[in-house]
C-alpha cells in the first residue's frame, strides 16, 4: 500500500491537532465538577462515562496523521491506567500542556533534543519532590477518603474501606454486577476454591444444601482414590478421634465414593470429598497453599508418599470448612504463621517477576486466599447505562486505593503538582534544556487550571492564588473554597500522580522530537462493477 509522508512542522502540526482533539474531550471530565462524555456503541445503549482511559480508547480520528497524535495520548492514558489504575485524565492534561508549549518553542527554532533533556531532568526532580511530600496510608479513614475522591462518591469510599479492612491490603476485591439497585459488599473469609462436594448426600444442612465441618482434619492429595483400602488406615485414625474429615483429591472413583457416602449416611463419621482445584502445575501450587494454610502435607508421588502410609500428623486442620455444590471454603487453618508468611513472600516475588497478566492475576488470587480472603462488591443501578458508569468509577476508586497503600498519598486537586514547581528551580539547565524545564513548570499548573475551569472559575486566577498559599493548601472546586487538602480528605495516590507525570513527559518528549510521520494513503473507492450483458430488467 502506498504511503504519505509529512516532515518537520507539517508532521508535528497534524499530530498536535490529534492531541488537542483527544485531550479536549478527556479533560472536560477532570475534577469534582467535571462533565461526562457519551460514547456510541456498535450495539446496545451508549456508554456515559468520565473515565479518561475509556474515552481515550474510544476515539478514532478520520485523518491518519491526527489519529497518530491522538493514539500517542491514548497510550499515555493506558500506560498510566496499567501502572496505577487511575490518573488517566491528569496524564492526558499534562501531555497536552507539555506538547503545546514544546511545539511553540520548536517552531520558534529551539532544539527538540535539548528540550527533551530538560523535560526529563524536570520530571525526575518533580517525582523526587512528590515522594518527599507523600503521606503513608495508616487508617481506614485514609482509604475511604482516597476512594471517595476517585469515585466522587463517599458511599463507595466507605464500601472499599470496609472491603480492604476485611481482606487486608493483599486481599482480592472483585467487582461484579448486581441484579438489584443497591451496591453491596460480600466478604468470603478464609480460603475459597471453586470445587464443590462430589455427592449431594454429603450435605449436613439440607435447607442451604451445604456441608459444614467443624474442626475437621483435611487429607490433601493429587492422587486418584479408587480403592477405599488405600485410605482405610487414616479413616480409622480420624474416627478414633471423633473428628470430621475433608478429602481433597484429584478424583474419587470406583467403590471408594459410595463407601464414603454410605458411612456418612449411617453416621459412622462426617466426611466430605471434593476435587482438587486448578489444573497441571497450578493444581500442585494450590494444593501446597492449602497444605501450608492448614498445617498439612500434600500426599504426592513427588515426595514419595503413599495414601496407605498417611498418618494423622500429615493431615491439615482448620476451625471450620463449608462446602457447597460449587465452592469449598476453609476458615482459620491451623498452619504455622511463619510458613504462611514465607509462602506469601514467595508468591509476591513471583508476581513482581512475571510478565504475563494472566499469571499475575492467578498469583494475586493465591496471595489473597493465603492473606485473608476475598471481597466481592456487587454494583447495583436502576439502568444498564448507570450500572456501567458506576462500575467504572468503583474500579478506578479501587485501583487508586491500592496505589495509595503502595506508595502513599499527596494533596489532591492538582495541588501536589503545583507545589513541586518551586523544587524545579534547583534543576541545573541552560539554553534549550532550561526551556524544557520551564515547559514542565508551566504544565504542572495545568491540572489545577482545568479543574477550576470545569467548575466555572477562571483557571489563571486560581493558579495565581494557589502560588500564594502555603504548601498543601489548595482549591476545593466542589465547595469553591481554599482548604488544607489533606485535612479536608482531598488526596491523590502518590503512585497515580507520579505515573501520570512520568508517562506524560515520556510521550511528549517523543512527539517533540518527531521529524517525519508516515501514514497509509486513503484508498480510492473502486467503481462498481458493470452489470452483465443481457441481464437488464431482472429483479
From Swiss-Prot:
Name listed for the protein in its UniProt record: Chaperonin GroEL
SUPFAM superfamilies: GroEL apical domain-like, GroEL equatorial domain-like
Keywords: ATP-binding, Chaperone, Cytoplasm, Isomerase, Nucleotide-binding
GO molecular function: ATP binding; ATP-dependent protein folding chaperone; isomerase activity; unfolded protein binding
Cellular component, GO annotation: cytoplasm
Domain of life of the native organism: Bacteria
Keyword ATP-binding: yes
Amino acid at each position: 500500500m502506498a504511503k504519505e509522508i509529512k516532515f518537520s512542522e507539517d508532521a508535528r502540526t497534524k499530530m498536535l491537532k490529534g492531541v488537542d482533539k483527544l485531550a479536549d474531550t478527556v479533560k472536560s471530565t477532570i475534577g469534582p465538577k467535571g462533565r461526562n462524555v457519551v460514547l456510541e456503541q456498535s450495539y446496545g445503549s451508549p456508554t456515559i462515562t468520565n473515565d479518561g482511559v475509556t474515552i481515550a480508547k474510544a476515539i478514532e480520528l478520520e485523518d491518519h496523521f491526527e489519529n497518530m497524535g491522538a493514539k500517542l495520548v491514548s497510550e499515555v492514558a493506558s500506560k498510566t491506567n496499567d501502572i496505577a489504575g487511575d490518573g488517566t485524565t491528569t496524564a492526558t492534561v499534562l501531555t497536552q500542556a507539555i506538547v503545546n508549549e514544546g511545539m511553540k518553542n520548536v517552531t520558534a527554532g529551539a532544539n527538540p533534543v535539548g528540550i527533551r533533556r530538560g523535560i526529563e531532568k524536570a520530571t525526575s526532580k518533580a517525582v523526587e519532590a512528590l515522594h518527599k511530600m507523600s503521606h503513608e496510608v495508616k487508617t481506614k479513614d485514609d482509604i475511604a477518603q482516597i476512594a471517595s475522591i476517585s469515585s466522587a462518591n463517599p458511599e463507595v469510599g466507605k464500601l472499599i474501606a470496609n472491603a480492604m479492612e476485611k481482606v487486608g491490603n493483599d486481599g482480592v476485591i472483585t467487582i461484579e454486577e448486581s441484579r438489584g439497585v443497591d451496591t453491596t459488599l460480600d466478604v468470603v473469609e478464609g480460603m475459597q476454591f471453586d470445587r464443590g462436594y462430589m455427592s449431594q448426600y454429603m450435605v449436613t444442612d439440607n435447607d442451604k444444601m451445604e456441608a459444614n465441618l467443624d474442626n475437621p482434619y483435611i487429607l490433601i492429595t493429587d492422587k486418584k482414590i479408587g480403592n477405599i483400602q488405600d485410605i482405610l488406615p487414616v479413616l480409622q485414625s480420624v474416627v478414633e478421634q471423633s473428628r470430621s474429615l475433608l478429602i481433597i483429591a484429584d478424583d474419587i472413583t470406583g467403590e471408594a465414593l459410595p463407601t464414603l457416602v454410605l458411612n456418612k449416611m449411617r453416621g459412622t463419621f462426617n466426611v466430605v470429598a471434593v476435587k482438587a482445584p486448578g489444573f497441571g502445575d497450578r493444581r500442585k501450587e494450590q494444593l501446597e497453599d492449602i497444605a501450608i494454610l492448614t498445617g498439612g502435607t500434600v500426599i504426592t508421588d513427588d515426595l514419595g508418599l503413599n495414601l496407605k502410609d498417611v498418618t494423622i500428623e500429615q493431615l491439615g486442620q482448620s476451625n471450620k470448612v463449608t462446602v457447597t455444590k460449587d465452592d469449598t471454603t476453609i476458615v482459620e487453618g491451623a498452619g504455622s504463621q511463619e510458613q504462611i508468611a514465607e509462602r506469601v513472600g514467595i508468591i509476591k516475588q513471583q508476581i513482581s517477576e512475571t510478565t504475563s497478566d494472566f499469571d499475575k492475576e492467578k498469583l494475586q488470587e493465591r496471595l489473597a486466599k493465603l492473606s485473608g480472603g476475598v471481597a466481592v462488591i456487587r454494583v447495583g443501578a436502576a439502568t444498564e447505562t448507570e450500572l456501567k458508569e458506576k462500575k467504572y468509577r468503583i474500579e478506578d476508586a479501587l485501583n487508586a486505593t491500592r496505589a495509595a497503600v503502595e506508595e502513599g498519598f499527596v494533596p489532591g486537586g492538582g495541588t501536589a503538582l503545583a507545589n513541586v514547581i518551586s523544587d524545579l528551580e534547583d534543576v541545573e539547565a541552560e539554553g534549550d534544556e532550561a526551556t524544557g524545564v520551564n515547559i514542565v513548570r508551566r504544565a504542572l499548573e495545568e491540572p489545577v487550571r482545568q479543574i477550576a475551569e470545569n467548575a466555572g472559575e477562571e483557571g489563571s486566577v486560581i493558579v495565581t492564588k494557589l502560588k500564594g498559599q502555603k504548601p498543601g493548601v489548595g482549591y476545593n472546586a466542589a465547595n469553591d473554597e481554599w482548604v488544607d487538602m489533606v485535612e479536608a480528605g482531598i488526596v491523590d495516590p502518590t503512585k497515580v500522580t507520579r505515573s501520570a507525570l512520568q508517562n506524560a513527559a515520556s510521550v511528549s518528549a517523543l512527539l517533540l522530537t518527531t521529524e517525519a510521520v508516515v501514514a497509509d494513503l486513503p484508498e480510492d473507492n473502486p467503481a462498481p462493477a458493470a452489470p452483465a450483458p443481457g441481464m437488464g430488467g431482472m429483479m
